[in-house]
């Protein structure tokens, strides 16, 4: 504990009652010295994070507020640019290249002792232009989640799903429901046969070379469109619809990440987590996201944020508290991952991650998300052909 932290903590204790809040805020103030504000997405364990904040507040005198605004990754770009926003932001690492390029997150400088506590590949994901721009927290990859009472063994291939769906329809069930509205969920199929966002070359990315419009991507998207055309999937399925259908036993399978397990547990569904199906004999290729905690470049509390992240959250106890609220999946901290690795769900997450690829952490990824979202929605709804939609996507991403 630094003297600076103790002094700020004493002053804060004298002035106010400590509170730790969890809310979805609509008004965002400038960062305030002697108080930590944290943003994290609503599908993550924000209540658990708040509990870690309570411990920090109790021991240091620094109040911690945890907020989960909608579309926080976009709001942060706008708000942080004017010197406002949270002290700490949690999001997948791919956004942090853009944040760093725009000067919105601070470079971090953990010592070697701390660096060695985390898996090296997780640090690679948060390195931009040779600098570390965030703390890796968890390793996220999509998996196939299946209801063991509806199917004895999950399909190994995407090509098996239509026949399985036809059988399950006799029981008024669906084989599979997953979020078609966001390309993060549809990309594993589209990328399986050779699609890629941007070409990796010599430790960087060629932003003029995108594989969203190659033969493999077209084949994957066509298969998805055919699932909709043949009424095995509905074009309007979003995250909430898919989650509710699976958790109510109406769908035998869904595609989701570790953050979804807590709600499945509550539903009492007898479920398993396994490898995503192959397509044309090749593994589905999910993006591997590293849940990352970055420090706002405008924050007056950078040392407090470092203390919170290094000595409270990124510990066995801190991650266990967050994981208990909503599962983190695999984690960056070696010591806690060793504890978690016995869970077959986490073994499946790591296996899918090994088949996938680390999301590029370049600012152009925002173009990828927008372009591929439009391409998928326009094709499954019949508004565009596959060729036209992917031509447009490639043009938007490489202009």
Model-predicted regions and their roles:
Residues 2-5, 15-18, 26-98, 112, ...:
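Conserved N-terminal structural module of periplasmic/extracytoplasmic solute-binding proteins
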Residues 86-87, 115-148, 175-178, 282-285, ...:
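A structural signal for short loop-to-beta-strand junctions that line the ligand-binding cleft
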Residues 93-143, 153-165, 274, 341-351:
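Hinge/lid segment of periplasmic solute-binding proteins
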Residues 133-137, 142, 162-209, 251:
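Extracytoplasmic/periplasmic solute-binding protein
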Residues 165, 206-236:
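Glycine-centered hinge/linker elements that transmit conformational signals in sensory
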Residues 352-399:
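Conserved C-terminal helix/tail region of periplasmic/extracytoplasmic solute-binding proteins
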């Amino acid at each position: 504990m630094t003297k600076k932290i103790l002094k700020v903590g004493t002053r804060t204790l004298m002035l106010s009652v400590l509170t730790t809040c969890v809310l979805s805020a609509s008004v965002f103030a400038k960062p305030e010295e002697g108080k930590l504000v944290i943003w994290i997405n609503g599908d993550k364990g924000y209540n658990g994070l708040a509990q870690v904040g309570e411990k920090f507040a109790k021991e240091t005198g620094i109040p911690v507020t945890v907020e989960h605004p909608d579309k926080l990754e976009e709001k942060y770009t706008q708000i942080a640019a004017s010197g406002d926003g949270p002290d700490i932001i949690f999001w997948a690492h791919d956004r942090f290249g853009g944040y760093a390029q725009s000067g919105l997150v601070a470079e971090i400088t953990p010592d070697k002792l701390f660096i060695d506590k985390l898996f090296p590949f997780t640090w690679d994901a948060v390195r931009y232009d040779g600098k570390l721009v965030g703390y890796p927290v968890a390793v996220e990859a999509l998996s196939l989640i299946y209801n063991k009472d509806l199917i004895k063994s999950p399909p190994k291939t995407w090509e098996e799903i239509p026949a399985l769906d036809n059988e399950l329809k006799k029981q008024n069930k669906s084989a599979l429901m997953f979020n078609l509205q966001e390309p993060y969920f549809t990309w594993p199929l589209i990328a399986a046969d050779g699609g890629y966002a941007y070409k990796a070359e010599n430790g960087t990315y060629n932003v003029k070379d995108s594989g969203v419009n190659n033969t493999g991507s077209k084949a994957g998207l066509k298969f998805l469109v055919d699932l909709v055309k043949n009424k095995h999937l509905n074009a309007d399925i979003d995250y909430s619809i898919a989650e509710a259908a699976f958790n109510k036993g109406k769908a035998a399978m869904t595609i989701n990440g570790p953050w979804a397990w807590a709600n499945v547990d509550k539903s009492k569904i007898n479920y398993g987590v396994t490898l995503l199906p192959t397509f044309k004999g090749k593994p589905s290729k999910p993006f591997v996201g590293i849940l990352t905690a970055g420090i706002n470049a405008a924050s007056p509390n950078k040392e407090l944020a470092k203390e919170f992240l290094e000595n409270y959250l990124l510990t066995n106890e801190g991650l266990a508290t967050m994981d208990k609220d909503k599962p983190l999946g695999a984690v960056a901290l070696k010591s806690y991952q060793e504890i978690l690795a016995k869970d077959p769900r986490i073994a499946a997450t790591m296996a899918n991650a090994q088949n996938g690829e680390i999301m590029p952490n370049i600012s152009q990824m925002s173009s990828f998300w927008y372009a591929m979202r439009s391409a998928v929605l326009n094709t499954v709804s019949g508004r565009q052909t596959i060729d036209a939609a992917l031509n447009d996507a490639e043009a938007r991403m490489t202009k």
